């Protein structure tokens, strides 16, 4: 029987399912026991420094990318952008702008695939297609959803990057201020925070990002990107 971290594959997927059921109910703060299910993944950095790692999934997007970049520049902050390959092809000028501004690029598959509902062969080809575009070693699965067999394959070829704070900016029932409070309440030194670079999250991110940057930077924190060679 296939295993992951010593646990049967069915058990690992069942436990992870409990945390990511269609993203209708989601953990803002990822429990430690969940992080231990995939120990090869990066969930957060050491806790002793006043450093926060912002990450933006799904871009580039014409609605939000340029504004995010300008806002980060205003505060001299860096971030990591997990880009979708088809969006890179649609908006190459925005993708170039992310790289020119010195941020880290991560792989978020070519078509934003759900690993639970996609065959391994198709999924791996889709991830590789993005890797050919970006050269990125860091990989974040869309929705966080991977089968144990996919984890076991991908961790040999990429550095899996998850998160320990999920802002909820995609949640239409969550107010922008509640999203901000999610981050402020649950982030610790070394936290990796997920926000989204897409039209659905634009209103919330427009509210959250400048307030988030002001809060942390005025308190002496650094907003840092993930090293693109992390795990090498």
Model regions: which residues?
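Short glycine- and acidic-rich boundary segments immediately preceding or forming the N-terminal edge
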Residues: 6-34
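C-terminal domain-boundary segment and adjacent tail
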Residues: 37-47, 74, 89, 203-232
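Alpha-helical scaffolding within the catalytic cores
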Residues: 37-40, 66, 88-99, 141-150, ...
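Acidic-and-aromatic substrate-binding clefts and catalytic sites of carbohydrate-active enzymes
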Residues: 59-63, 82-91, 113-121, 140-146, ...
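A cross-domain feature marking catalytic cores of carbohydrate-active enzymes
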Residues: 56-58, 83-85, 107-109, 141-143, ...
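CE4/NodB-like, metal-dependent polysaccharide N-deacetylase domain
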Residues: 69-78, 103-104, 110-113, 120-148, ...
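Active-site beta->alpha N-cap acidic-glycine motif
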Residues: 25-107, 111-114, 135-136
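His/Asp/Glu-enriched short active-site or ligand-binding loop at hydrolase and phosphoryl-transfer sites
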Residues: 16, 145, 151-186, 220-232
């Amino acid at each position: 029987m296939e295993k992951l971290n010593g646990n049967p594959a069915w058990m690992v997927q069942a436990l992870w399912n409990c945390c990511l059921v269609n993203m209708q109910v989601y953990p803002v703060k990822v429990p430690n026991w969940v992080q231990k299910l995939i120990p090869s993944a990066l969930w957060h950095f050491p806790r002793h420094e006043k450093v926060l790692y912002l990450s933006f999934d799904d871009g580039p997007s014409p609605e939000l990318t340029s504004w995010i970049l300008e806002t980060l520049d205003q505060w001299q902050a860096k971030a990591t952008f997990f880009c979708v390959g088809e969006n890179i092809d649609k908006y190459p000028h925005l993708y170039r702008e992310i790289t020119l501004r010195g941020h880290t690029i991560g792989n978020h598959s070519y078509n934003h695939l759900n690993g639970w509902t996609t065959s391994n062969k198709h999924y791996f080809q889709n991830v590789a297609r993005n890797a050919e575009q970006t050269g990125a070693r860091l990989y974040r699965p869309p929705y966080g959803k991977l089968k144990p067999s996919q984890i076991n394959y991908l961790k040999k070829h990429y550095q899996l990057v998850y998160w320990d704070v999920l802002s909820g900016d995609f949640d239409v029932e969550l107010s922008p201020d509640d999203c901000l409070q999610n981050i402020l309440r649950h982030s610790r030194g070394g936290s990796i925070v997920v926000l989204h670079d897409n039209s659905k999250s634009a209103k919330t991110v427009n509210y959250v990002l400048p307030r988030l940057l002001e809060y942390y930077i005025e308190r002496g924190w650094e907003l840092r990107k993930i090293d693109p060679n992390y795990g090498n």
